[in-house]
């Protein structure tokens, strides 16, 4: 207030309300992976977290889908084949995929299709020269330390790497979440390396690889999903490459008309490459006239539509948070753009996933007749912990901690006296009361749902005050999901 030296009227404003707690964000994921590009105009976005809100913005800054190439050939063996059919004895119609598989674009489609919104993208490389490895992921995680708004970490392409690399990436991610103490990791289980590998071996390998540190800061989902991101029109002659198409008499047999058509399609001048138009014309002819080619095209589509569930689950987290609140378990929810899970999990099999001896629970995605495909699990990897067994409990606590922490910064260097303690207690109590009214805390009255303690002789000693320390204790009763519902029926004697 100005000093009163000149006669006149002076205005003094006083705050009528105390400082309030602003709710922290709860479902802002950061996706780390390979993109077509990473630019904003002339600015490079490589290894730089960039905020987007839609698939349109993703394409604007990070480009479109990859252009996979599948080679079709006539071979004398069936090794390394995505699709293989013996046409005549000793000769195989074979489809192989020699190019690296980049899936972040498709995973982002799944994220937005399942309720996702605002998120961050960290591009660690491009399709031409990028790869997912431990060093790239560590650099990306370091860049995310500066973005406190991020609350979920997802690396959907980790499972495209070798099993050992995937293990190291996942342990780095969960360590990052535990050290930051404001974010949660969503994991996938590495796919089978051989068809004969069992589901139990897959799960055991993941549980062994994830380690034992900060397990409450992550959750895993199983199995892979057969999605509908890729349609028939996305599979054309530029995807299915058949450079030996002009000479396939042994395959087509009597179908000389088709052979002649292909010869015309691929008639090129010496020294020039086959055009995409020629490839697409041949592709259309083969689809109509040869069932084996159509089967191969469908197999390629199925292969590209096979995606891990983590990105879709990030969308589910965002949708549930926005509609019900972070305290609602992200389970018993249907998945969009999913035709089926790759494995059919029975009740008996889920027992070992949901409640393993080591506590490292894996949340199942299951098909229920007449209901659809649902997320059927809500546990963290710390399933043996009474405190942090459930995803919504861990994430609700992160939400409360981050919100209160941000609000408490306003009181740093304030006098460590009773008035300050009272203001702090009132501010935190008001925030928790709002959470309780929304259903985030359990209790019929506020006193049963939470309590805030601060003050000399209550949470602090005289030494604490002398050393500039203010200690606050907050007790909360977070709601827990009804994971098991038991209904008892008993007959009673007729009364009239």
Give, region by region, the residue ranges found by the protein language model:
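Structured, hydrophobic secondary-structure cores that serve as assembly/anchoring elements
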Residues: 1-118, 139, 145-159, 165, ...
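A short, well-structured beta->alpha microelement
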Residues: 125-142
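Extracytoplasmic, non-cytosolic globular domains
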Residues: 170-173
């Amino acid at each position: 207030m100005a000093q009163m030296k000149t006669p006149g009227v002076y205005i003094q404003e006083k705050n009528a309300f105390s400082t309030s707690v602003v709710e922290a964000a709860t479902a802002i994921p950061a996706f780390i992976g390979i993109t077509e590009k990473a630019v904003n105009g002339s600015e490079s976005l490589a290894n730089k977290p960039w905020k987007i809100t839609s698939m349109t913005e993703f394409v604007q800054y990070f480009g479109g889908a990859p252009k996979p190439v599948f080679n079709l050939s006539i071979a004398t063996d069936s090794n390394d084949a995505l699709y293989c059919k013996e046409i005549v004895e000793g000769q195989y119609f074979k489809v192989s995929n020699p190019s690296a598989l980049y899936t972040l674009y498709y995973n982002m489609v799944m994220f937005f299709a399942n309720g996702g919104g605002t998120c961050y993208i960290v591009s660690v490389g491009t399709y031409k020269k990028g790869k997912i490895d431990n060093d790239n992921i560590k650099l990306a995680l370091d860049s995310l330390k500066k973005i406190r708004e991020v609350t979920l970490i997802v690396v959907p392409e980790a499972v495209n790497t070798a099993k050992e690399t995937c293990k190291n990436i996942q342990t780095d991610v969960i360590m990052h979440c535990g050290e930051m103490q404001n974010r949660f990791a969503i994991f996938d289980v590495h796919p089978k390396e051989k068809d004969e590998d069992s589901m139990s071996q897959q799960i055991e390998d993941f549980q062994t690889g994830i380690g034992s540190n900060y397990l409450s800061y992550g959750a895993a989902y199983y199995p892979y999903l057969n999605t509908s991101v890729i349609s028939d029109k996305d599979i054309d002659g530029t995807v299915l490459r058949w450079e030996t198409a002009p000479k396939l008499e042994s395959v087509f047999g009597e179908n000389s008309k088709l052979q002649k058509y292909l010869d015309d399609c691929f008639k090129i001048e010496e020294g020039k490459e086959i055009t995409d138009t020629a490839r697409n014309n041949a592709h259309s002819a083969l689809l109509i006239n040869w069932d084996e080619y159509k089967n191969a095209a469908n197999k390629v589509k199925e292969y590209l539509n096979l995606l891990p569930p983590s990105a879709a689950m990030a969308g589910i987290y965002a949708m549930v948070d926005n509609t019900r609140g972070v305290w609602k378990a992200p389970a018993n929810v249907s998945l969009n753009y999913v035709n089926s899970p790759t494995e059919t999990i029975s009740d008996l099999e889920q027992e070992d996933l949901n409640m393993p001896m080591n506590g490292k629970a894996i949340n199942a995605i299951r098909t229920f007749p007449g209901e659809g495909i649902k997320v059927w699990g809500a546990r963290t990897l710390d399933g043996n912990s009474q405190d942090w067994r459930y995803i919504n409990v861990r994430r609700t606590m992160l939400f409360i901690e981050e919100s209160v922490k941000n609000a408490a910064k306003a009181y740093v260097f304030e006098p460590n006296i009773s008035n300050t303690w009272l203001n702090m207690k009132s501010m935190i109590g008001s925030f928790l009361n709002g959470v309780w009214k929304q259903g985030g805390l359990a209790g019929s009255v506020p006193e049963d749902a939470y309590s805030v303690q601060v003050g000399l002789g209550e949470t602090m000693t005289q030494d604490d005050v002398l050393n500039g320390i203010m200690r606050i204790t907050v007790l909360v009763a977070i709601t827990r999901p009804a994971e098991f519902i038991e209904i008892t029926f008993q007959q009673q004697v007729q009364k009239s």
